[in-house]
Amino acid sequence: MPTDIEIARAATLQPISAIAETLGIPDEALHPYGRHIAKIDHAHIASLEAKPEGKLVLVTAISPTPAGEGKTTTTVGLGDALNRIGKRTVICLREPSLGPCFGMKGGAAGGGRSQVVPMEAINLHFTGDFHAITSAHSLAAALIDNHIYWGNALGIDPRRVAWRRVVDMNDRSLRSIVQSLGGVANGYPREDGFDITVASEVMAVFCLARDLADLEARLGRIVVAESRERKPVTLADLKATGAMTVLLKDALQPNLVQTLEGSPALIHGGPFANIAHGCNSVIATRSGLRLGEYAVTEAGFGADLGAEKFIDIKCRQTGLSPSAVVIVATVRALKMHGGVEKKALGGENVAALEKGFANLQRHVENVRRFGLPVVVAVNHFHADTEAEHAALKALCRDRLDVQAITCRHWAEGGAGAEDLARAVVSLAEGGAPATPNFVYPEEAKLTDKIRTIAQTLYGAADIQVESKAAAKLAQFEKDGYGRLPVCMAKTQYSFSTDPGLIGAPSGHVVAVRDVRLSAGAGFVVVICGEIMTMPGLPKVPASEGIYLDANGQIEGLF
């Protein structure tokens, strides 16, 4: 089997205008970026409001392992398969971040025969959306320090500036810094730090905004600091929102690309699900629902993170509700959850699979708590055995009364996921609730919301909130932010805050180290355990294998 980049490069892509035509998008509504990428202008997006919505399919997964699950690959394969069986489908994905692309995870354009293309462009600079978001965030950071430098009319307390800087790269050395050194001309020295761009509240606002007006209003609500009187200072107070919206104006138009099979895909926005809310833009999702009979989207990492935030944050704010949920699992990953080391995954081990099944079981049970119909997609790997697949399907049937379907879309494209597509259509057309069941009520205390997620979805005995975090939660409540949902930032590898505690642990304690207010996005970020909002690179980063060949073509991307 050729590599992902070789498959993508060998494909014959249609002009992006031809892809747009299948959705009824006229040429004048497109802003092309070359021959195979285009943005859809704001006016056409607004015109879609009059159209009826199709059915929304959410793709999520078990707790990820180094063995890989293939959630994006499955999302693409399912979208292709739905189109193959006659359901006009739009795929809605997040944009990849450069940090993981050059780090350990690699890109995020799918894999094998189920990819969105042009793969190199999507995984690298794409249409510059992340650069625009980084620039808007950086403008806000500059305006804060400039305001303090020129007299500080708002009375900002430099010790209580919450707005960190961002860059779209994994760089642990920037997590904690001291700024404004070198003399009085450089401002007032203070502690600061960088997050990765996908953790920026500007990214979250970008992905939750309905339109440009909503974007500007949300930017204005962002709290960046406290005054000496402990009052919130917002970007509206700093008169930053107009210029920031100008920087984001073009970026807010969703990006249209295609799959290897010519299915339309909207790729827009890209918050991580372990340190942010993990969903693509509301604008792209809503557009996909009005352009197709089905819109297939994903939420990052496992259902405990991405799917919970999709429901409790994105659906709560927008009124969206999935008609069906797909949980992606692999035999390999479940064997790892059952205690098998990665190097030993090639051998048949039904006993380990049965032990690791507890992880899948909890994710299925959690999705059912939302009141949503669910199916399991078993992403096939070449080393899997028939006995392992039969055992997994039997476990799903006997213990959970849920259908598990073997999918071969990585090797076969959409044809390998047609059984999954038919199962999804059956679930979606069988009737789903107009509104999902949220995990906690809006009026609950912030601490109670955190505890409810930990105990209900993670299997925890309780939470342990550090004193600094408890004081900030109390202040948020006092300032009127108590009705906001919470956005859990924790390791993606475990239901606990310990990445080594795999499977389905129970009785653990979720340690809450810090909290951050995202008033513009409309949630409170809860930082648990040792999770970092600025990742680091691994010992051998993926960047070491990326290069240009003698013909100027990119090699090594995956």
From Swiss-Prot:
Catalytic activity: (6S)-5,6,7,8-tetrahydrofolate + formate + ATP = (6R)-10-formyltetrahydrofolate + ADP + phosphate
Pathway the protein acts in: One-carbon metabolism; tetrahydrofolate interconversion
GO molecular function: ATP binding; formate-tetrahydrofolate ligase activity
InterPro entries (UniProt xref): Formate_THF_ligase, Formate_THF_ligase_CS, P-loop_NTPase
Listed SUPFAM superfamilies: P-loop containing nucleoside triphosphate hydrolases (SSF52540)
One Pfam entry name: FTHFS
GO biological process: tetrahydrofolate interconversion
EC number: 6.3.4.3
Keywords, comma-separated and alphabetical: ATP-binding, Ligase, Nucleotide-binding, One-carbon metabolism
Sequence positions that bind ATP: T65, P66, A67, G68, E69, G70, K71, T72
Presence of the UniProt keyword Lipid biosynthesis in the record: no
Tree of life domain: Bacteria
Family named by the database record: Belongs to the formate--tetrahydrofolate ligase family.
Protein name as annotated: Formate--tetrahydrofolate ligase
Organism: Methylobacterium sp. (strain 4-46)
